[in-house]
Amino acid sequence: MMKFACKAIALSIFAVTSTFTMAEETNTLSQYGLSFSGNAALTTDYRYRGMTQTQSDPALQGGFALSHSSGLYAGVWGSNVNFGSADPHLELDPYVGYATELPFASKPKLDVGLWYYGYPSASDFNWLELYAKLGFSSVIASGDSLLAAVNYTNDFFGLEEDAWYLNATYTVPFADTGFGGVASVGYTKADDYDFSDNGSEDDNYVDWKVGVTYSVKSVPGLSAELAAVGTNIDANAQPYKRGVETGAVFTLNKTF
């Protein structure tokens, strides 16, 4: 399954980028139903599902995606990482998916795809994950959104073990101020994996985030977020304890 899915991702990205090159040579992207997007971010701590991926140090992140009007998309996202060992220092994740609006009154948006966690200098950590997301807008207040996600892999962190991740994220704008709020809660369950550092054999944990966002009106696409991020992982030793307990994370993000 892993090899097949990886080939599918590679072929999909190649196909989309090839189309992009042809379109650039002959006409604009929009005439081919294609659109390009990207982002760059600087964060004080790369927290993945509540757990630091940089030993609580800052991270520079970014990515790009090509989307087609049919709903198909493919892209790559990257960040520096530090797991406390010599390698890896870079995470580079290709992904491919399909998003569509469902024909219901609330017009929820379904997004399904494959995400490959790649570590070029430590390929033993590489693993593939399947995801499905369902998004709703104007749930409680005008302009808000609720996103529910389910993720599954049979090769968690390259260990050939099953793992599930469930998450719900809610965002809401504060009137027309540019400020907003964000809150999320997630649950991870991994077979034969101990997230504690004291032999508690905790194969599951809960993560959370509560924060405030700000969109800079004078600079389109520029936003900032200050959030409290943490988990209920039972940890005693540093620096692992610091990297899983609740802490403040500031992120500056620019989309284009």
What is the role of each PLM region?
Residues M1-S35:
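Cleavable N-terminal export/targeting peptides
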Residues W127-D203:
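Detector for outer-membrane/organellar transmembrane beta-barrel domains
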Residues F36-A40, G62, L72-V76, P94, ...:
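Transmembrane beta-strands of outer-membrane beta-barrel proteins
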Residues L42-Y48, G78-N82, T100, Y116-P120, ...:
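Transmembrane beta-strands of outer-membrane beta-barrel pores
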Residues A23-S35, G71, A86, E101-K109, ...:
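Short loop/turn motifs that connect adjacent beta-strands in outer-membrane beta-barrel proteins
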Residues Y32-L34, S56-L60, P88-L92, P108, ...:
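Residues that define the transmembrane beta-barrel architecture of outer-membrane proteins
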Residues V210, Y214-V216, R242-F256:
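Outer-membrane beta-barrel "beta-signal"
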Residues E24-N82:
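Short glycine/proline- and aromatic-enriched beta-strand/turn motifs that initiate or cap beta-hairpins
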